[in-house]
Amino acid sequence: MKTRFLVFLTLLLSIYGWSQHQTNLVVKLDDDARELTIEQEITFVNTSDISWDKVYLLDWANAFSNLQTPLAIRLAEDFKNRFEFSSDEDKGFTDISSLNTENYIVSRPKSNPDVVILELLEPIAPQTSRSVNITYKVKIPLDDFTGYGKSSDNEYLLKYWYLHPAPFVNGEWQFYSHKDLNDFYGAPTQMSISVHVPSRLKAISSLKMITQVEQENRNSYLFEGLTSSSARLYFLESTDGFKRYSTNQVDLTTDIDDESVPTEMKVVFIDRIASFLNDHVGKSPSRELFISDKFYKENPVYGLSSLPSFINPFPAGFTYEIKMLKALTRKWVEQGISTHNRDEYWLKQGIIIHTIMKYQEQYYPNLKIGGKLSDFWGIRGFNVSQLRFNDRYAFLYLNTKRLNLDQAPNTPADSLLKYNQQLAIPFKAAIGLAYLNDYLGNNAVENSIKKLYSQSPSNSQNSRDFQKYLNEQTDKEIDWFFDYFITRHERLDWKLRNIEKYKDSVIVTIKNKSVYPIPIPIYALKNDSIVYKEWINGFIGDTSITLSRKAIQNKKLGAANRIVVNYEEIIPEFNPRDNYKTLKPFPAFNRPLEFRLFKDIEDPEKSQVFLMPDITFNIYDGLAIGSRFYNGNLLSKPFRYSIKPAYGTNSGKLVGSIGLSYEHPFQDRNNSLFSMRYGLSANQFSYAPDLLYRRGSAWLSFNYRPKDLRSNKRQSLNFRNVFVQRDRNDESLEEDPDYNVFALSFNQSDRNLRRSFSYSFGTEISERFSKASFRLDWRRLYKDNRQLNFRVFMGTFLYNDTRSNDDFFSFALDRPTDYLFDYNYYGRSEDDGLFSQQLILAEGGFKAQLDPAFANQWITTLNSSYSIWKYIFVYGDVGAVKNKGTSARFVYDTGIRLNLLQDYFELYFPVYNNNGWEIAQPNYDEKIRFIVTLDVNTFIGLFTRRWY
């Protein structure tokens, strides 16, 4: 009996002393084949109480194997086309040669081709271990796709290159595919890697180097360490760029550098950051840390390097320190807290940003985002220049909140919009932690973070564990934070509805405009100084509180003269502009009017009107130089107005526009109706020499978007009424230059990298005509980087009482008359000259000027183009045009298209059409058509599409 007990005790101690998986790898690089040959022994340790009949391995190197993997699909969704157009030789894959053995069978989940299943013929019993040997080859991809792989310098940066055990948590295996989100989640594994590379290369790793042997033909290395993330392995021609810094807390190896910062100062910064992290997060589980510049650039400090290198408005070494702060904090948290990095994305990211904010508060409390530039004349007047460094987090988060694109912090990382994944959700989570800490007091959040961190990284943690630790720190109720703030996306908003003033007290009524109850602070101010602050528990609808006059006065500052909700903007509120009420007697203003030059961030204490220089162009008015008065700032807002008076330098006339609009967002993601917009607009410009047009429009638009915000599917239903009044042209035969048109249209689109599809149909009704039209656009990108485009347009008049010789309202084959003044023509009335060659791809969409040019009965056209080399396309158009009293006319058109920047800068060269060989006819230069877009907002959309 005693012997059995000793055997059992020995086995139990060995299991608990060796609770992580272990793996030994022998890795050989074939430089010519861009291939790793790997012999791997994995010892699986089953510390659960469930037998394992199969185990899962993460094989993210195989994510590069074809265009159907989750990674390939993700890259295409983000409009990253390099992988899409790469050859098979440039991609990567894993080739497991030991497919079947006596001990296990290898397979892969259908939807996860970068995960390997080892089906064990004999299960691994609880509290036992089993060793498995696997031999395989890994084809290394080029680094063009994710930044990792073989570079053009013939060096190798390897991140996901071997088989790593997946974690087994709460009775189930947790695994997911590579999607370039830097969210690898593996089981803690003790690793030993023997690496052999050609002698021209040196190896360095995120694991500790144990031995190094350099020989004539090859260099050999041994790396060891414990990790739950993928072990990074770099093969470089020189590792001299990596420096080692030893401090009291850590020994750091890094190639993050700044030549302007002395080594001694770098050591001071690293030691200060490490000491701060040790005090506020916890002691690092490993003294040896490896942080590469590549690691930092995966999640950098956005905007820090926007200024030229010769302009440094920050304190000496600040840029280096903040880079190191971001990278070191991320490394510290990732290696010390084990969570499901995709489903619990907000938790780690929130802790990382929250810790960075605390550091900046301690060492740079008054530093502004512009540094010294914020004090320069001409810059210091802008509100944005006065933002403190920590204020940018709330500002950047509110960007998506104002666009109605906010998502709940607990949304899985792969379901987030790119902007939310990179910026908004980490920032919102961090702000939420700061908000919670202010409400609870006594450093409850920081203490809970340290408790979370103190648990062994071998123990997987989640939000429920964090909530438990918080409850241990306070008697206050905090369920609202996890039930509402973390799990909901709806906006937070309050309004200071009313103040009743009495001799000894003030009764304040606050309206909660959001859908859930969370605490809110209320303040009494003397000018801009806080006299009194009180937290109000969460409520729905309205609530009233009584503040005694005695409480809201201060011996030094005197009596308060303003009451404000959320004055310090602790909570990222949707609209703080209605949070202010004055205690001053009438006629004081709650928010005085302020005029500001150029666009800026809003000041919630004032009603702001922004003034911007504005320049437009058409050949009749010339440069229309004027000013734009509007209430729009750097963040979107529901109600907008814009007044743009201008003077035409050619016409010598007053021109311009005015617009009012309101957007009502719908926050219920289960309802596809995303927003409703309505408004009024009017403008006046020249449409011909010495002739003005005046257009007024009222419009209503319903916009639809799927629940999955990452989807590019869009729908809209639009109603508008357009009234046009034109100066009469004595040379024209028109009887009445004024008209009114009601238009109804429905649009649907799904624009993606591989395939773009959209269609619309609509109708227009006027006193003299009614018409219906249909348009379809389709584009396909092929593996060889060839592009095929189709466009179909069909239009018919339901009735047409216009004169037969007047084609102003007719369908156009190549150049729409634009009687609704929707298009940005630079010379809309030109019949010859350069500006008559401007092409607007609408209606018939032809490029050549053919006869008949218009259709007063019906028209059907098909436009197509196909790329033959890079930006050179061939195009072809065919169609039929029907006019009253004549038979339908078949038309066709072919030529060459230079697609320099699609929809923004294109040239069309007609070759052959109904007129014959255009290229052989005189005045060919007059037949070339061009597309040039000068709308900056449209151009910016080309670059922001992957973020929203």
Label each region the model flagged.
Residues 79-98, 108-110, 132-232:
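Extended, low-hydrophobicity, Ser/Thr/Pro/Gly-biased non-transmembrane segments
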Residues 193, 218, 222, 242-347, ...:
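Juxtacatalytic substrate-recognition/specificity segment
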Residues 204-205, 289, 478-479, 492-567:
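Beta-strand-rich binding/interaction modules
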Residues 343, 349-431:
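Acidic/His/Gly-enriched intrinsically disordered linker/tail segments
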Residues 411-503, 508:
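Amphipathic alpha-helical substructures
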Residues 518-520, 528-530, 536-537, 547-555, ...:
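Outer-membrane beta-barrel initiation region
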Residues 677-688, 699, 742-867:
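C-terminal outer-membrane beta-barrel translocator/porin domains of Gram-negative envelope proteins
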Residues 898, 902-903, 925-948:
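Outer-membrane beta-barrel "beta-signal"
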